Amino acid sequence: MNELVNDNLYETRNNLVKEITLLSDTEFNRKPDMDMWSIAQVCHHLVLVEEASIKAIAWGLKGNDRTSTERKNIHLTLLDRTKKIKAPKIVDPDAAPFEVPQLIDLLNDSREKLLAFLSTIEDKAILKEKSVKHPALGELPLDQWIEQIYLHEQRHIEQIKEIKLLLDVKH
């Protein structure tokens, strides 16, 4: 994994944790609307997406074929919040309430699993040569599966900021 991707994973996760650390559990779990997720649910969704991404990359690596596909401008899709993307059921968050420290632990655990998994890949070049279909982005090279983790997280940090405004949360 190149240094820029690693830095982006680190910086984005730090920004996410800064957004949620000072929230009370009530603020964390309050939904601004019945049809919207709470901040806790957004964070749980991010954990589930990171874990699902590990599985997708692992599955792609097991395939014998070099299924190289064109690189996509995934940032255009993921960072454009005017384009709504319906989450697949497998990454739908729990409705049960969470405590802020509990979810920070889950976020840390999923990131540790991701980094540990990536460290087992001896030849990182293979990540550009194989691909797996992403539910929202289509056929995606495995290295872009890693990029989509932090881009997707950046998208949801903006959503968290919007939810905080709707809930009139000051921190």
Residue ranges and their predicted role:
Residues 2-5, 96, 100, 142, ...:
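Amphipathic alpha-helical coiled-coil segments and their boundaries
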Residues 21-33, 90-98, 112-145:
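Acidic interhelical loop/turn segments
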Residues 13-21, 50-54, 58, 111-122, ...:
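Structural signal for well-ordered, non-membrane alpha-helices
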Residues 1, 9, 15-16, 20-48:
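Long, hydrophobic N-terminal alpha-helical segment
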Residues 6, 10, 43, 47, ...:
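Short amphipathic alpha-helical segments with heptad-repeat character
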Residues 81-105, 109:
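Alpha-helix-centered segments that form part of catalytic cores
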Residues 4-5, 11-14, 123-126:
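Metal-centered catalytic cores of metalloenzymes
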Residues 32-78, 127-171:
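Short, contiguous alpha-helical
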